[in-house]
């Protein structure tokens, strides 16, 4: 499966959707909906940094895909009144790639590195003195004649974003003064986001229609906005352009997104665990082979929402479906589930 082909995939949008997303993306903390703790803390840190005429401390933002890490990075630059230069970990293959970005920064600018956990070790080593001392160590020459020179850099703010904070090395993680975790959004916050996006796009949308889209958006703004665009297509062709609860329900059912926000891939994963592995426990590699998927797709794309909603739990012996999965498909709950631990007990346990 190509992740971007899923309507409810939270991975990066396609080129045309990226243009539309930029149009509806909030540009200030005042317009930033949800994540109240993150918003309040960042407002405080930014106000303090501006009051001292300093650059904001280096900031790490992590959480599942589609929750607004890039949006928050752009808001930080906007609120600080500085420019932002964006790149991603896989793009920075050589130290020279990073050096070119750093030497072109103006004082207090923001350097945003998406997927920062994918930085190569050699590039990461160059980043350490840049973050800590605002200096760049560069090797000149080769062999015995090689020597290191130090270049002073203007004070800047590094904003790193990652979906896998656990893959960051300790030296890199320790150099971030501010660490923010983005959580899945509530349905109410998503409904507000959908209504705001519809207003910007000029779409007639009832509050009930916004709520119907929001509750199937898997707690993710990117998915909510993507569903809104597809429901708009349906409404323009079959409902005179007006999005009501009934229209949204018909459109999303046609798109195979059920009332819990599951698509065929989610249902396939759950049914495979129930039918082929007796509900688990099953190792992630065995599960990946059974549904012909990559391990990282299960861990980064499919699992997070299913775990957060209590349909799957991780135990020391592997993945296990909960009674909610059986109820979702109208199946009889095995008697052994009555003896299983509560869903939250093993969510953070290490898989074998």
UniProtKB/Swiss-Prot annotation:
Entry comment, domain topic: Has 3 domains, the large (RuvB-L) and small ATPase (RuvB-S) domains and the C-terminal head (RuvB-H) domain. The head domain binds DNA, while the ATPase domains jointly bind ATP, ADP or are empty depending on the state of the subunit in the translocation cycle. During a single DNA translocation step the structure of each domain remains the same, but their relative positions change.
Which GO MF term does the entry hold, naming one? ATP binding
> What's the encoding gene here?
ruvB
Name the InterPro entries for this protein.
Answer: AAA+_ATPase, AAA_lid_4, DNA_helicase_Holl-junc_RuvB, P-loop_NTPase, RuvB-like_N, RuvB_C, WH-like_DNA-bd_sf, WH_DNA-bd_sf
Which subcellular locations apply to this protein?
Cytoplasm
Quaternary structure and partners: Homohexamer. Forms an RuvA(8)-RuvB(12)-Holliday junction (HJ) complex. HJ DNA is sandwiched between 2 RuvA tetramers; dsDNA enters through RuvA and exits via RuvB. An RuvB hexamer assembles on each DNA strand where it exits the tetramer. Each RuvB hexamer is contacted by two RuvA subunits (via domain III) on 2 adjacent RuvB subunits; this complex drives branch migration. In the full resolvosome a probable DNA-RuvA(4)-RuvB(12)-RuvC(2) complex forms which resolves the HJ.
Q: What is its EC number?
A: 3.6.4.-
Q: Where is this region: Large ATPase domain (RuvB-L)?
A: 4-185
Q: Does the keyword Nucleotide-binding apply?
A: yes
Give all cystine bridges in this chain: none
Q: Which family does it belong to?
A: Belongs to the RuvB family.
Record: residues binding DNA: 295, 314, 319
List the residue ranges of the region (Head domain (RuvB-H)): 259-352
| Top-level class of the enzyme under EC nomenclature | hydrolase
Primary site of residence: cytoplasm
Catalytic activity line of the entry: ATP + H2O = ADP + phosphate + H(+)
The alphabetized UniProt keywords are:
ATP-binding, Cytoplasm, DNA damage, DNA recombination, DNA repair, DNA-binding, Hydrolase, Nucleotide-binding
Gene Ontology process terms (BP): DNA recombination; DNA repair
Q: Which residues bind Mg(2+)?
A: 70
PANTHER family noted in UniProt: HOLLIDAY JUNCTION BRANCH MIGRATION COMPLEX SUBUNIT RUVB, PTHR42848
GO CC annotation terms, alphabetical: cytoplasm; Holliday junction resolvase complex
Has the keyword DNA repair been applied to this entry?
yes
Q: Where is this region: Small ATPAse domain (RuvB-S)?
A: 186-256
| Name the UniProt record assigns to this protein | Holliday junction branch migration complex subunit RuvB
Source organism per UniProt: Pseudomonas fluorescens (strain SBW25)
Free-text function comment from the UniProt entry: The RuvA-RuvB-RuvC complex processes Holliday junction (HJ) DNA during genetic recombination and DNA repair, while the RuvA-RuvB complex plays an important role in the rescue of blocked DNA replication forks via replication fork reversal (RFR). RuvA specifically binds to HJ cruciform DNA, conferring on it an open structure. The RuvB hexamer acts as an ATP-dependent pump, pulling dsDNA into and through the RuvAB complex. RuvB forms 2 homohexamers on either side of HJ DNA bound by 1 or 2 RuvA tetramers; 4 subunits per hexamer contact DNA at a time.
Q: Give the lineage.
A: Bacteria, Pseudomonadati, Pseudomonadota, Gammaproteobacteria, Pseudomonadales
């Amino acid at each position: 499966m190509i992740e971007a082909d899923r309507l409810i995939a939270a991975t990066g949008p396609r080129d045309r959707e990226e243009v539309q997303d930029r149009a509806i993306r909030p540009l200030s903390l005042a317009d930033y909906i949800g994540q109240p703790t993150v918003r309040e803390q960042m407002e405080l840190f930014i106000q303090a940094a501006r009051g001292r005429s300093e650059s904001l401390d280096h900031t790490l933002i992590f959480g599942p895909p589609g929750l607004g890490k890039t949006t928050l990075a752009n808001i930080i630059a906007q609120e600080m009144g500085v420019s932002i230069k964006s790149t991603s970990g896989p793009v920075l293959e050589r130290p020279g790639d990073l050096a070119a970005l750093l030497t072109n920064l103006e004082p207090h600018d923001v350097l945003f590195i998406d997927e920062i956990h994918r930085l190569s070790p050699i590039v990461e080593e160059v980043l350490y003195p840049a973050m800590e001392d605002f200096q760049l160590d560069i090797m000149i020459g080769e062999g015995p004649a090689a020597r290191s020179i130090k270049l002073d850099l203007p004070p800047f703010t590094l904003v790193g974003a990652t979906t896998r904070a656990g893959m960051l090395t300790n030296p890199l993680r320790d150099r971030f003064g501010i660490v923010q975790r983005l959580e899945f959004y509530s349905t109410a916050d998503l409904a507000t986001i959908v209504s705001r996006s519809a207003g910007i796009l000029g779409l007639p949308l009832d509050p009930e229609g916004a709520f119907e889209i929001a509750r199937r958006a898997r707690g993710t703004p990117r998915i909510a906005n993507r569903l809104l665009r597809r429901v708009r297509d349906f409404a323009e062709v079959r409902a005179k352009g007006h999005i009501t609860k009934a229209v949204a329900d018909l459109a999303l059912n046609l798109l195979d997104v059920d009332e819990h926000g599951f698509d065929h891939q989610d249902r396939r994963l759950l049914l495979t665990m129930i039918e082929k592995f007796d509900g688990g426990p099953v190792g992630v590699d065995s599960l990946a082979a059974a549904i012909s998927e990559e391990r990282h797709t299960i861990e980064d794309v499919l699992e997070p929402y299913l775990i957060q909603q209590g349909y799957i739990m991780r135990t020391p012996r592997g993945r296990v479906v909960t009674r909610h999965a059986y109820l979702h498909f109208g199946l009889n709950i095995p008697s052994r589930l009555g003896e299983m631990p509560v869903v939250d007990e093993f969510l953070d346990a290490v898989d074998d």
